[in-house]
Design a protein with these regions (language model features):
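Terminal-region recognition feature
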Residues: 1-107, 113-114, 118-271
Length: 271
């Protein structure tokens, strides 16, 4: 029986649930010798909405600035959001804490995945998932997938080259796209990739000294090359097909990605 079923059967009040949660966090902190911070975004919102924004950075800053600890375990649950906000949050927590682990039991998609890849460790339950990396951009009054936007423009360009025309609706839409806007979308995607390529070697790979198979020393260039391969794989929309696709532990540990994940369900103290 799961904990939630147990709590329902016990008819726990909101206050009792809060006390139970604080007790579990305290127990977790002792087991891991860490400070657990819980961040949960608006999973119920559609992906195009941006629940992870600069407002979240200011909240995280206010809640963690006075914490006196070397280790931070950051529980994250979000469908995605702003890459710039992720950069600010990571810059702050990396400057404040010596060791950071990210804990994923629900969804940490898109920008949430980028943040998770800045950790020294990644802890996941079987129910947890990351997602394809795809920056979100604001076009007019809507926030949409940068990749989908670029693919749509590419599709319309190819259609125009092949047939010599576009239907009136598409022609009107394309006419409103400026070169600067299109360039900005390309830069947004590259920005997301750059963060992953910078953070993986610096943090997740910092103790990767010897290769597992050939047992040869790992150079900084090898770390950067591997980080770029992982970023490219997570941005490979031909493989994942959907922005909201769940990337599970088995996917992350597969040969094509090859990340080491700490499996919470295999740890009798944590599960």
């Amino acid at each position: 029986m799961g904990l939630m079923s147990e709590y329902i059967d016990r008819r726990m009040s909101a206050k009792e649930m809060e006390e139970e949660l604080l007790m579990l966090i305290s127990k977790y902190n002792k087991i891991r010798n860490t400070y657990l911070f819980v961040y949960a975004g608006a999973i119920g919102k559609p992906i195009p909405d941006i629940p992870l924004s600069m407002d979240d950075y200011y909240i995280v800053f206010d809640m963690l600035k006075d914490v006196n600890a070397d280790n931070l375990d950051f529980y994250i649950e979000t469908p995605g959001g702003s890459g710039e906000a992720v950069e600010e949050i990571v810059r702050f927590i990396r400057n404040k804490f010596s060791n950071i682990a990210f804990v994923v039991s629900g969804e940490a998609k898109s920008a949430g995945t980028i943040m998770v890849l800045s950790g020294d460790e990644i802890l996941m339950t079987n129910s947890g998932s990351l997602g394809p990396i795809d920056a979100q951009v604001k076009i007019g009054r809507s926030v949409i997938s940068a990749y989908d936007y670029i693919e749509w423009v590419k599709e319309k360009r190819e259609e125009a080259e092949k047939t010599g025309k576009l239907n009136p609706f598409d022609a009107t839409m394309v006419a409103q796209i400026s070169p600067g806007e299109l360039s900005g979308v390309h830069h947004t995607l590259k920005f997301a990739e750059d963060l992953v390529v910078e953070w993986l070697p610096k943090y997740k790979f910092k103790k990767w000294d010897i290769t597992e198979t050939r047992k040869i020393p790992v150079t900084e260039e090898m770390k950067k090359k591997r980080a770029r391969e992982i970023a490219n794989e997570l941005m490979n929309h031909a493989r994942w097909r959907s922005h909201g696709r769940s990337i599970k532990i088995s996917d992350l540990e597969s040969e094509s990605i090859g990340l080491k994940i700490i499996k919470v369900d295999d740890d009798s103290q944590l599960r």
